[in-house]
Amino acid sequence: MATAIRSGRIGGWERFCQWVTDTNNRIYVGWFGVLMIPCLLAATTCFIVAFIAAPAVDIDGIREPVAGSLIYGNNIISGAVVPSSNAIGLHFYPIWEAASLDEWLYNGGPYQLVVFHFLIGISAYMGRQWELSYRLGMRPWICVAYSAPLSAAFAVFLVYPFGQGSFSDGMPLGISGTFNFMLVFQAEHNILMHPFHMLGVAGVFGGSLFSAMHGSLVTSSLVRETTEAESQNYGYKFGQEEETYNIVAAHGYFGRLIFQYASFNNSRSLHFFLAAWPVVGIWFTSMGISTMAFNLNGFNFNQSVLDAQGRVLNTWADVLNRANLGMEVMHERNAHNFPLDLAATESTPVALQAPTIG
């Protein structure tokens, strides 16, 4: 009876606190979720509206607007939320900073609204992962793994614009805009020749390879619990204590396929490796983008091989450099008078006076 009376006196704030932190809810909210939900809702709503109906944005700050929305002629592939104008630079540009809504849209205000709310939302999502793990008594490595894609998002949406001096250099929010960002990044920073990007490629493709290898090995060494007429999936019951596959058989197969010590004999160390490999690789990629944001670029091996007479023997580094120069001169064509990359090459002799005729 005393318990019933005491629970009846719980105020609204206490009930809200209990609901927020209740791990028996179908979807755990958590205190980080209180921040995450409105931020991601705001970012998603603004993104959808801008992707469909936003007017053209003066991204380069030279009064040549670029249209990114569907009703301005784009499709799902070519459409994007265009980054805020180079005229805005790194200034914080909420709606109330503009003289009118039309000016805010023309200068790409929706991009900042989406990006800032998105970054806060996904950061809170990582905090929510830690919070739920803590309340369930689990180890905290889920949020550590999630920090890899989180760091990548911060690198392309925040750190890179900071380093370049304008949010107009941030990654557009669309498919073709992402590809354009990648091509321009290669042209300006030679990211393919940066060792941190190479480690990131090894992390992503290596992680895909290891995931496929692990899944196929487990699927091929399942303990048979069903007949030929039934699906093997029916041989597993959620929460069962016994192993569903024979790790000894998988270890023996893979050890003989390559060599003994290439195969894990400990399931825990195996799954740690499967998590750590791509996470560390993506961490390195994020660090690479963050350093190239401040123009600490990839290796330059241009014209590094010469013959005995001092003539250049072109390598693939020179081929890549030619491609970089082509991409550099083609992007933002009307914003550059003369690209510095071309001005930095060997000078071409020109006649300083007219030749004498006769």
UniProtKB/Swiss-Prot annotation:
Pfam families in UniProt: Photo_RC (PF00124)
GO molecular function, one term: oxygen evolving activity
Sites where the protein binds chlorophyll a ChlzD1: H117
Broad class of the protein's primary localization: membrane
Positions bound to chlorophyll a PD1: H197
Protein family according to the UniProt entry: Belongs to the reaction center PufL/M/PsbA/D family.
Protein name according to UniProt: Photosystem II protein D1 2
